[in-house]
Amino acid sequence: MKILVTGAKGFVGKNLCCQLNNIKEGKARCYGDLQVDEVFEYDIDSTPEQLDSWCGECDFVFNLAGVNRPKDNDEFMKGNFGFASTLLDTLKKHNNTCPVMLSSSQQASLTGRFGNSEYGRSKKAGEDLFLEYGKETGAKVLVYRFPNLYGKWCRPNYNSAIATFCNNIANDLPIQVNDRSVQMEILYIDDLVEEMICALKGQEHHCEFEGLDVLPSAEGRYCYCPVTHKTTLGEIVDTIYECARAVRAVPDSTEGPSTALEMPQDSLRYRLMSTFLSYLPKEKAIFDLKMNVDPRGSFTELVHTLNCGQVSINISKPGITKGEHWHNSKWEQFIVVSGHGLIQMRKEGTDEVLNYEVSGDKIQSVIMLPGYTHNIINLSETEDLVTVMYCNEVFNPERPDTYFDKVEK
């Protein structure tokens, strides 16, 4: 399948083209037998000759081209309606009745606060043009009215409040919120792209519109993305600030769902965290962890969870023995990832010592059994022993459940 994407360098176009090229190159294998042979990327710097050629070859068109922030309102109609006319005329010239998708906007409803929107009028004119084209040629026409869009690569200080908030907060710049109570319906870019792939496979979601409300209908003239989120401007801002606080610290869900550990993949919080991270400046993408260092090596906590314990990294210097303690109830798993070591355990009240020789050459997990005193010994004379340590509970200094006793008496 050969696919033409207009507006390919815009926010939606860039994300869509990347995923289409992933499919083309065999990198995205989750779409069954969908095959993409070519992705024709048309944008403002493309030539009329390229558009003409690609309209003759393509098997599907995503028309994302349009004007969002012109210098004067006349450019809305020229950019949104005018190019749509050129595109459809070129397809007609080649008798190409392949499916065509139009990126429209909620503002095309011309209802409520959008009643006098010049942008909305230009989008509505484009919709009518496409729908008439479908009747005239028999081509399948998919008209999507998108709500507010957000996600990685969205340009800040342009036409997305979320992009501006994420960019400013990530860069310690002030933001302006005039009314926290404003209701918003927002659509995440990856959810949009997934719907575009559905459309490519003939599995688009149809609807009618009653004002801004989507009325799902298999016979509907319009299409919609089934995954959106309705929230307030204030809730969006608060969540982005929560993301900012959680980023430069050990992931810790013990005090609430403010980290990625407690963000279900279908949640708005997950989408806003991913979006926020895409705006982090270079210097904020790296930060120090608290290393507990002594002459024996170091111990650094990596992850705290509310109900699933913690993960840490332990480094032992050559010849060093660590541990020599046992627990009543909590258990641990030691996973040596570099170096050569010996893990020993002995059941309290007995003399038998269990020995487990481990190394980074063969990754294994050794369970520290409750009621067994245990240690870990670096057998190397020259190399550090690096061990990932999982414990089923986060360490509580007031109830450590840890009792010193050497394994070998």
Task: Name each region found by the language model.
Residues 147, 164-187, 207, 215-225:
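A conserved pocket-lining segment of Rossmann-fold NAD(P)-dependent short-chain dehydrogenase/reductase
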Residues 128-153, 173-182, 217:
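Conserved beta-loop-beta element that borders a ligand/cofactor-binding pocket
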Residues 284-324:
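A short glycine-rich, His/Asp/Glu-containing loop-to-beta-strand
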Residues 198, 202-290:
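Mid/C-terminal beta-alpha module of Rossmann-like enzyme folds, strongest
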Residues 1-26:
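N-terminal Rossmann NAD(P)H-binding glycine-rich loop of SDR-like oxidoreductase domains
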Residues 85-127, 134-137, 142-144:
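Conserved Rossmann-fold NAD(P)-dependent oxidoreductase catalytic core, especially the SDR/UDP-sugar
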Residues 43-86, 90-94, 107-114:
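NAD(P)H-binding glycine-rich loop region in Rossmannoid oxidoreductase-like domains
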Residues 156-164, 181-202, 206-207, 234-235:
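Substrate-positioning beta->alpha
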